[in-house]
Amino acid sequence: MNMGVDKKQNTVLYISSAIALLFVLWGVFLPENMANVVNKVFALLTTNFGWLYLLAVAIFIIFVFGIAISRYGKIKLGADDDKPEFSNFQWFAMLFGGGMGIGLVFWSVAEPIMHFNSPPFGEPGTVEAMQTSMRVVFFHWGIHAWVNFAIAGLALAYFQFRKGLPFLISSAFYPLIGDRIYGPIGKAIDILAVFATIFGIATSLGLGSSQIATGIQYIWGIPAGPLTISLVIAVITVIFTLATVSGLHKAMQSIANVKVWLSVAFMVFIFYFGGKVFILNTFTQSLGDYLQNFVGQTFWMANESWVGGWTIFYWAWWIAWAPFVGQFVARVSKGRTIREFVFAVTLLPVGFSFIWLAIYGGAAFNLDQISGGFIQNAVNADYTTALFALLQQMPLYAITGPLAILLIVTCFVGAADSATYVLAMLTSNGDMDPSKKLRSFWGIMQGAMTIVLIVVGGTAALKALQTASIASAFPFMLIMLVMCYSILKALRSDHP
């Protein structure tokens, strides 16, 4: 099959697509075997290597901010005379947009309530548990997440815009292995980047489709089982794949605009009806707790099972997303200095995320108290209902419920469309305008792999999705650690 890639140089495509297809077939024909392997891999990595995930992300934080404040921070991502392609306002808006994803919509209500009911330490259901839950949520969605994207984006932008190398993860290793980035070692690095992206996105799409199906059940009574979730994934996959094939760029842009406006509208609506003063108090308290406990929480492993199920999952998820988000922030940052890039990428989206989480989480706690535990009970029964349980406690639920589903759909379509672009680019030698056929192929494959994880996981679908991220992120985490050294070596060599 010719998917618009040079046949002589598409090793990454052939190997990646073959492994992806084998994974799908494994889940279809041997689901119980896959489920057993999933459980064993999850236990192995979280039990034996949890410490490494925590240390790696801590190293990433030190590295990326160290580079930014050093003399290398003045270096441009591009030629010395390159100007930024976008104004500051446009650039900031794009980075803010990067923070609005399926995961944020999914977890912004569910996670605070889940930590409130089962905190990592202390008594559940107390004021202290509420404060701890919001602190932990800020921790999981804060700087520790975005430093991963900053490192991948910095590597892609520096070696593409300043050195003229392909827009591939393997290019970041040129200072270490030279032209061997075009050989087996470089191909292996790009293949690992492909699978980190596939499983990181599959986790997000799995969560998003589950929430859509639950919303349909919550509002219209249609059961939200694996079949419904699979149909949701299939239908949306067909939509964005057809849009890609047809070249309906205006349609995709319209969907992106709807996502932004709906996101802002929901934030304003929930802030107004969710208890403005309570939310502002929640934001202030949570931000202070986050900053005060930043270092200690970074290395905290006293409750290994909790850390394995939450923090390590998040760190792996963000690492798996690094090639995906990294290429986005790199593409829009040509002409920026390293210092501008690092501080904008790590702080602006985090600020937006904190506001979002404080509004949704604060409103959830406030309205849960007023309703006598309605939201808490809903989350205990099924955490995917959290957002709809919150909206049910506010006016205009007949309107906001369906609009919430529309918001999740726009997030799903946007993430899937961007993911297929990244996967097509990674498997076409860094071509920044990959063929529609190749993007369509990865769109279909992405949907199929997400369905496999949902069906194989069954009642434990979340664990299957978590394991997919943790397992795919492990080798890429090691790649990112070496990548940090390679970036530093390049900077020292180019700017002694």
Swiss-Prot record:
Keyword flag Transport: yes
Molecular function as annotated in GO: transmembrane transporter activity
InterPro entries listed in its UniProt record: BCCT_CS, BCCT_transptr
Biological source species: Desulfitobacterium hafniense (strain Y51)
Protein localization: Cell membrane
PANTHER family given in the database record: HIGH-AFFINITY CHOLINE TRANSPORT PROTEIN, HIGH-AFFINITY CHOLINE TRANSPORT PROTEIN-RELATED
Entry keywords, A to Z: Cell membrane, Membrane, Transmembrane, Transmembrane helix, Transport
One Pfam family linked to the record: BCCT
The protein's role, per its UniProt record: Probably acts in the uptake of glycine betaine. May function in the pathway that allows anaerobic methylotrophic growth of D.hafniense using glycine betaine.
Keyword Membrane appears in the UniProt entry: yes
GO cellular component, one term: plasma membrane
Membrane topology qualifier: Multi-pass membrane protein
Name recorded for this polypeptide: Probable glycine betaine transporter
Similarity annotation: Belongs to the BCCT transporter (TC 2.A.15) family.
Spans through the membrane: 11-31, 49-69, 89-109, 136-156, 188-208, 219-239, 260-280, 306-326, 341-361, 396-416, 441-461, 468-488
Upregulation: Highly up-regulated during growth on glycine betaine.
